[in-house]
Amino acid sequence: MSLPSWRPSSDTMKECVEIFATLGTRLATFGHTERDKAIIASAIEQNGWFTSEDILRAVEAIRLEMLDRDKLQLWLSRYTPTTHPQRVAIIMAGNIPLVGFFDLLCTLCSGHHAYIKPSSKDRVLM
């Protein structure tokens, strides 16, 4: 299988900041709608170790620590995007809600291609 001829640049990192900061903004209200509550209930049904408090705490931590626009810009400003994207396999654990999110964020923002095997216990959230 051939990968697209995409070459990361500083514009790619800016785009990454925009996309993930927008996701952070959208997650600010997660857990308040009936749809969100159904997603949480489905995740708990899939993984009996998850609680709604754990899920909400994970989403809030991701939003505040990983998806804050200023923090993303500062973090990514320290790196140069790759000029030779690699395929990065991410095998996600399912013991903590959304535990594989940071791996995905790092892979995509560095300009690599993510190949993900989500945990069978965290498919609803990821």
Regions found by a protein language model. Name each.
Residues 74-126:
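Conserved small-residue-rich beta-alpha loop and adjacent elements
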Residues 1-89:
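N-terminal Rossmann-like NAD(P)+-binding subdomain of aldehyde/semialdehyde dehydrogenases
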